[in-house]
């Protein structure tokens, strides 16, 4: 692939050269899901765990991830699946994502400190819809936690 420089910021790049004089380049940028704290600072990562950048402070607009086993673990994969399933307006409120196993993902909504108990990543799209409806019915400023781990029986405290 001459002419295309390697970059960790790109997930895919594929040049296509349909004849006779056209060149099409398709590029897919990596999308960060959050940052992981280490002795070097906060490393912004995508869902595959690819490091995109490191800064001394948490990057604004990206939650801090604490997944047991780090990138490549089942806990990290579950956090990534959950985060990507959230609608943009809820995603923007998430400041922390934790998981000690793939079955206990928990989110924190920064403006209020409200905890979202997610459980495992199964049915994440459905859980995201249930969470959005619960947040509309009872906004986070009046709730200490939402439990959508059993999405057919959401619990708000």
Give the residues covered by each predicted segment:
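Charged, solvent-exposed interaction patches on well-folded alpha/beta domains
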Residues: 2-157
């Amino acid at each position: 692939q001459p002419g295309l420089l390697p970059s960790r910021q790109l997930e895919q790049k594929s040049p296509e050269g349909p004849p006779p004089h056209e060149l099409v380049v398709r590029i897919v940028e990596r999308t960060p899901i959050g940052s992981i704290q280490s002795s070097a600072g906060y490393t912004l990562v995508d869902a595959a765990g690819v490091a995109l950048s490191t800064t001394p402070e948490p990057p604004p607009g990206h939650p801090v991830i604490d997944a047991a086993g780090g990138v490549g673990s089942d806990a990290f994969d579950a956090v990534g699946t959950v985060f990507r399933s959230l609608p943009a307006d809820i995603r923007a409120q998430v400041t922390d994502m934790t998981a000690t196993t793939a079955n206990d993902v928990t989110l924190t909504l920064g403006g209020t400190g409200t905890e979202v108990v997610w459980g495992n990543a199964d049915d994440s799209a459905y859980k995201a819809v249930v969470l959005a409806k619960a947040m509309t019915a009872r906004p986070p400023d009046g709730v200490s936690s939402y439990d959508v781990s059993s999405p057919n029986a959401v619990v708000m405290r």
